[in-house]
Amino acid sequence: MENINWSDLSFGYMKTDYNVRCYYRDGKWGELEVSSSEIINIHMAATCLHYGQESFEGLKAFKGRDGKIRVFRMDENGKRMQSSSRGIKMAELPVEKFEEAIRKVVKLNERFVPPYESGAALYIRPLMIGLGAQVGVKPALEYMFMVFVTPVGPYFKGGFKPSKVCIMRDYDRAAPQGTGTIKVGGNYAATLVAVSYTHLTLPTIRL
């Protein structure tokens, strides 16, 4: 990718060639589908929009000195996504299908994997959303699992250098006995006020 400065990438979104999708309907998961579209169509009453039926994961692919592409312990991410699904009553995706989707999307976007020792990586974002239309708090009957990728630089530009930390005592990321042990979007939405405040004061890690 001659137009990408691999050593100066931010941790943000960059369009790549393909994403992979899979739908849960009639009590079972379908086959993996490949799409080049960045857009998804969902019903206005989908449970992901109203009742928070959404989970996601994050992992990276790296290119080694030998030119091979490696992803570290993707099965553990698949298991954690299953745990998130159980936590908010979504359909569980088999770990084998999760791994198949990861391998497929990385292969399809191989040209976006940064070179060895560039300091960058191919970030992999699996996510699942409730698609079924519901008015009333109940689980959806249909779900979509998808994976997209984007090349990224380090999350913290300072790398392993010491970072200032801001502890916010006025906000909770997740309630006790709630969803704090699973990876769902609501946990992160609850931090946005605190994050906005600390961005006004100093570059920090928010706890």
Feature-to-residue mapping (PLM):
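Conserved alpha/beta cores of soluble small-molecule-handling proteins
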Residues: M1-Y197
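Conserved small/polar residues in nucleotide/adenosyl-binding loops
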Residues: T198-T204
